């Protein structure tokens, strides 16, 4: 059965018709004035026949009856009612500036801790809620998120408010998060200071969720039961401001918070935060101060909050007209909010509009896909979009009786209305909705009937931006499930009070836009969702492109290990889209934060040496250059050096592991034998085996029988070693005069292995292919394997300093069984050894098959050129392709218009070399999977240091990527 979000709009508001007048169906507002007026007029005329005024009474009565009947015909058939519309019309025709001083619905609250004392005596408690991961998740996970909303809706007291606030991320707090734990690293502090301008240009934003629950009417809230509680307190003479009352409010708020699903992480706000909420909603779009950090206790009186003046229609700036028409109002459909009183400089004037949701599809909106409020984050118009949801729980039995009355009215209307104005169809539709509503309530005794009202608050710094934003909002709402919103002229000031908690529903007109629904159906709108990616601390990786908020994405690999998650990262994608650029940024950030890096670069290009040229404590080791040694007997600890030497050298030498020679060799390479015989290197081992061989010529052989036999057994080993020692690409193994880098003391070790040639997995797995491997390939297997194991052993032995192993162009290494085995071991054990691994690959499906990536969660995926690879990578990343066919927006490369222009347009080029990168409109874009398995598109942050940016770039003949 298809799940859906649904509002049972109008089930209790069926227009009433009657056919008492000439058996003609008329609305009650038309029939009553017509019947009463006609009868009254005729009766008065008859009674006054002798007075001489009968004709006048008849004429006036007929005119008055016609007028009242006409007015009755204008009464709206649906909510909002005539009273709301008349007040809005009056406010448009006779506008007046209303302030926080003289208008109760605009009054400022008194604040104590997380309590909000409204002007009318209502008391609310405020909590911050966490949005739940939802974007690009599977249907199963989305359903789980919606089910948590169901529990939330069932636990909230009546007349609770959920606010979704569009706020700017605190850039100062972002910088503090980046330097957290590393304030002693001057180079990292300087790097973060350079990022400040980048953050200011990006203006990252996020959505903040705020819950306000009434605590002055008991656990039930502001409904019939709650009103009875308030009446009892009134009879008892309870003082709302006493210490005992405050404690009772706080205890009730604590009880409500504990009843909510813990996934929402309800956190009590402070008085300073509540003051910020007042200012944010009052000067929406112009007040940009960040949310204050939590502080203990505190109170703020209403007089300490800035007061505001609400100019409906912005009469102060109404257009100039000829003098006779200058008294006419402006007729603008917005309100201008300005500061007044002693805090008049709090923020510039704000232009605002509040648009309620008035209708939704009758059959509901298919879930997933019903999260229409998420569309607010897709709008980038220069305005700020907030939303408010009022939830009023209704007693089940009262709701059943209410439905019965509505059903009875429908049955009656079948007789009175007939098919006037498509009446039969409308009545049947309403009857179906009531039946479905009753079915949902009856199916589950825990199902909670709700009255839900939705409001969207738009604020901007100027009217033009506001008007454009409202038009875009209407388009988004239409595309997000055919949600109908209305913009009422003259009602913005009154509707604004929906964002001032504590104002009675009939005062703020919230009751005019409430829709009957159930907790389970409301939950499918999933309003409390988040597209946040990354960590709370760490380096600036990029900006979230899952919506228009552009929120900052941080990456903290060492923190991942401390959180008991796997600090390994895969960076995959086609060449030229920024894999290496991103990896270099990550490595430099970790170096500046105190980590060590071990980089294997299978290329003679030397891009990593260029990128890290300014790092002082490093070693760049060219395996073909003869600068450093890579001998297992020298580079590994004594206790494991011999066994590791056997692991890599025996396959390279082509010896049978079950042979006598290898058995003898295994005995010689035990730690005790090596220490006794001085076998500290492969060259020393060769000298020892050579020395125990039979003397040349006629010299007397004085060897013991045991040594003679040992020499004979080891002769195949000596011959193989001497043969391999002649190659230039094996000198790192056989030349014991080459220095061994002190990896523990170095910050960076770059191993350039371009002179090596690793075979692929098939060549290693198939015996007939393996025997055909060249000596260079066999040596490459040994050297590559030793490098990866060396990094693992070195970093695993130091759990006090984070170590990062980087495998650039990791395909050749991971397609060898030895390299894949060690890389897999790192992926399983890196966490507890405080070690991370960064794998850079162009084809993760093929390159990681032998190694296995089941323990690696974090991935950065840049676009691919081939759709087949893109689809396979998307599926392996956990993106359900059947639910997100638009995956190509993230994974497939797209050329920019500049690159596909007509050749004759070359005259438009700027002088000098081309700056085109060939990566099209997706340059710098990536798909990121963080350690918590959240998925989303990001824009990789550009390196702010121009020198480093150029050093990272590998585009030929380009100054910038």
Regions found by a protein language model. Give the residues of each.
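P-loop NTPase motor core of the ASCE superfamily
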Residues: 643-684, 847-961
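Glycine-rich phosphate-binding loop of nucleotide-binding enzymes
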Residues: 16-42, 132, 139-141, 146-154, ...
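Switch/coupling segment of Walker-type NTPase motor domains
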Residues: 133, 139, 159-182, 190, ...
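Conserved P-loop NTPase motor cores
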Residues: 28, 414-415, 551, 557-577, ...
């Amino acid at each position: 059965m298809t799940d859906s979000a649904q509002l049972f709009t109008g089930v209790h508001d069926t227009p009433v018709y009657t056919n008492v007048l000439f058996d003609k169906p008329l609305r009650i507002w038309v029939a009553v004035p017509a019947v009463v007026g006609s009868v009254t007029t005729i009766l008065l005329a008859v009674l006054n026949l002798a007075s001489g005024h009968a004709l006048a009474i008849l004429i006036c009565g007929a005119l008055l009856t016609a007028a009242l009947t006409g007015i009755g015909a204008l009464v709206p058939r649906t909510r909002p009612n005539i009273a709301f519309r008349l007040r809005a019309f009056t406010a448009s025709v006779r506008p007046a500036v209303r302030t926080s001083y003289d208008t109760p619905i605009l009054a400022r609250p008194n604040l104590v801790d997380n309590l909000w004392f409204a002007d009318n005596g209502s008391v609310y408690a405020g909590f911050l809620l966490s949005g739940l991961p939802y974007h690009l998740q599977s249907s199963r996970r989305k359903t789980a998120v919606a089910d948590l909303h169901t529990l939330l809706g069932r636990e909230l007291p009546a007349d609770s408010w959920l606010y979704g606030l569009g706020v700017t991320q605190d850039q100062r707090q972002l910088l503090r998060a980046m330097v957290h734990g590393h304030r002693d690293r001057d180079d990292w502090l300087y790097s973060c200071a350079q990022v400040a301008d980048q953050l200011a240009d990006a203006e990252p934003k996020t959505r903040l969720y705020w819950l306000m629950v009434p605590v002055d009417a008991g656990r039930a809230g502001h409904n019939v039961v709650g009103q009875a509680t308030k009446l009892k307190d009134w009879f008892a003479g309870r003082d709302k401001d006493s210490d005992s009352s405050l404690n009772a409010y706080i205890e009730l708020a604590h009880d409500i918070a504990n009843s909510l699903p813990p996934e929402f992480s309800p956190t009590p706000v402070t008085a300073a935060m509540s003051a910020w909420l007042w200012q944010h909603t009052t000067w929406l779009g112009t007040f940009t101060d960040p949310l204050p950090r939590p502080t203990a206790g505190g109170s703020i009186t209403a007089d300490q909050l800035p007061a505001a003046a609400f100019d409906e229609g912005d009469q102060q700036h109404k257009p100039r007209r000829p003098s006779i028409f200058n008294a006419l109002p402006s007729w603008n459909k917005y309100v201008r909010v300005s500061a007044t009183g002693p805090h008049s400089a709090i923020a510039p004037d704000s232009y605002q509009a509040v648009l309620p949701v008035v209708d939704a599809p009758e059959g509901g909106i298919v879930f997933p896909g019903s999260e229409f409020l998420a569309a607010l984050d897709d709008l980038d118009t220069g305005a700020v979009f907030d939303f408010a949801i009022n939830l009023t729980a209704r007693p089940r039995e009262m709701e059943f009786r209410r439905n019965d009355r509505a059903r009875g009215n429908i049955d009656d209307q079948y007789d009175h209305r007939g098919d006037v104005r498509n009446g039969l169809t409308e009545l049947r539709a309403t009857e179906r909705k009531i039946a479905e509503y009753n079915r949902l309530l009856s199916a589950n005794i825990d199902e909670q009937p709700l009255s839900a009202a939705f409001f969207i608050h738009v604020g901007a710094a100027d009217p033009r931006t506001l008007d454009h934003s409202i038009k875009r909002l209407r388009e988004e709402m239409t595309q997000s499930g055919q949600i109908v919103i209305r913009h009422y002229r003259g009602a913005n000031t009154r509707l604004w009070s929906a964002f001032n908690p504590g104002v009675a529903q009939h005062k703020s007109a919230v009751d005019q836009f409430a829709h009957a629904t159930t907790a389970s159906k409301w939950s499918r709108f999933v309003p409390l969702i988040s597209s946040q990616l990354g960590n709370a601390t760490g380096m600036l990786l990029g900006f979230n492109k899952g919506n228009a908020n552009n929120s900052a994405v941080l990456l903290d690999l060492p923190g991942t290990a401390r959180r008991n998650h796997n600090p390994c990262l895969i960076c995959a994608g086609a060449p030229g889209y920024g894999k290496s650029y991103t990896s270099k940024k990550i490595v430099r950030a970790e170096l500046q934060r105190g980590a060590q890096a071990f980089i294997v670069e299978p290329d003679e290009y030397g891009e990593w040496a260029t990128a890290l040229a300014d790092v002082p404590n490093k070693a760049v080791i060219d395996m073909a250059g003869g600068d450093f040694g890579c001998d297992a007997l020298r580079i590994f600890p004594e206790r494991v050096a011999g066994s590791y030497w056997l692991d890599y050298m025996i396959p390279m030498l082509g010896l049978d592991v079950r042979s006598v020679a290898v058995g003898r060799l295994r005995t010689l390479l035990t730690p005790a034998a090596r220490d006794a015989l001085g076998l500290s290197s492969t060259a020393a081992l060769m000298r020892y085996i050579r020395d125990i061989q039979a003397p040349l010529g006629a010299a007397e052989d004085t060897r013991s029988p045991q040594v003679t036999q040992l020499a004979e057994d080891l002769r195949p080993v000596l011959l193989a070693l001497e043969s391999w020692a002649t190659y230039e690409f094996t000198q790192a193994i056989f030349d014991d005069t080459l220095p061994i880098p002190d990896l523990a003391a170095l910050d960076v070790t770059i191993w350039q292995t371009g002179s090596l040639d690793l075979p692929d997995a098939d060549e290693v797995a198939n015996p007939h292919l393996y025997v055909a491997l060249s000596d260079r390939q066999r040596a490459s297997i040994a050297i590559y394997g030793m490098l990866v194991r060396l990094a693992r052993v070195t970093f695993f032995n130091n759990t006090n300093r984070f170590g990062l192993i980087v495998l650039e162009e990791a395909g050749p290494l991971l397609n060898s069984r030895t390299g894949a085995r060690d890389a897999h071991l790192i992926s399983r054990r890196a966490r507890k050894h405080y070690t991370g691994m960064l794998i850079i690959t162009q084809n993760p499906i093929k390159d990681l098959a032998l190694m296995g990536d089941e323990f690696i969660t974090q991935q950065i995926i840049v676009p691919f050129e081939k759709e087949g690879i893109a689809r396979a990578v998307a599926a392996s990343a956990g993106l359900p392709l059947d639910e997100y066919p638009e995956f190509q927006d993230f994974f497939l490369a797209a050329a920019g218009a500049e690159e596909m222009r007509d050749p004759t347009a070359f005259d438009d080029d700027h002088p000098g070399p081309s700056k085109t990168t060939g990566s099209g409109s997706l340059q710098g874009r990536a798909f990121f999977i963080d350690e918590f398995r959240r998925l989303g598109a990001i824009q990789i942050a550009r390196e702010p240091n121009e020198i480093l940016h150029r050093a990272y770039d590998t585009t030929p003949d380009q100054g910038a990527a």
